[in-house]
Amino acid sequence: MQEFLATSERRAELYWWFATLFSAELSDKQIAEYDSYDVRSFLKSLSTLDPMRPAVTELNEAIARLLVRDERATALAADFKGLFLADTAVQPYESAHLDASSLGRMQQRLVRLAIDVSAKYPQPVDHLGVELDLMGNLIIRAAEAPSADQREQWLGEQEAVLHGHLLAWFPHFEVACRAADPFGFYGASARLLGVFLTMDANYLSLVKPASSAD
């Protein structure tokens, strides 16, 4: 159980990190943190996982370019706006890659779960950041569940969001983002997120049956 709790905390942190990354422009202070010991250690720990290693290497290379980029915060903000906010943007919304019903399904899910994201995310609720943030919250609910049955329920909710939403459309977003990002920071981040989502789906398929025993 302790291993489950530790893994849950790490998974939630990853989802929230990616949610922040794709939801708003990074400030210069946030960019500077990518040169900190904590972030370097964090990425190094991810690179110990074989499926993640090439994606982490690509992101580290993009970070190295970003840290020495002229007016880096302004330049990265321009990348963000051009990629995700312009008329020809790579839309970070599920409904833009599947169909309009995706937005309604996510709205219904949040209502059923009694989760309100409006204060944190002004975007429509099928935005990538919202779906990633939701996964982080569901992970913590599973970790804090007082019984095996409730833990099983929250693990099932995680699988539903992953397979019913994120994995259904994110691969399309990832391809488009990588093709449209010449500097490469967001493209590399999307690649790493894609690997993580696949690995997390595999993790859930393994941990869900085993979690039924306290």
From Swiss-Prot:
SUPFAM superfamilies: TorD-like
A Gene Ontology cellular-component term: cytoplasm
Highest taxon of the lineage: Bacteria
Annotated GO biological process: protein complex oligomerization; protein folding
UniProt-annotated location(s): Cytoplasm
InterPro entries: Chaperone_TorD, DMSO/NO3_reduct_chaperone, HscB_C_sf, TorD-like_sf, TorD/DmsD_chaperones
Keywords: Chaperone, Cytoplasm
Function: Involved in the biogenesis of TorA. Acts on TorA before the insertion of the molybdenum cofactor and, as a result, probably favors a conformation of the apoenzyme that is competent for acquiring the cofactor.
Entries under HAMAP family matching the protein: TorD
Protein family (similarity comment): Belongs to the TorD/DmsD family. TorD subfamily.
Annotated protein name in UniProt: Chaperone protein TorD
Organism: Aeromonas salmonicida (strain A449)
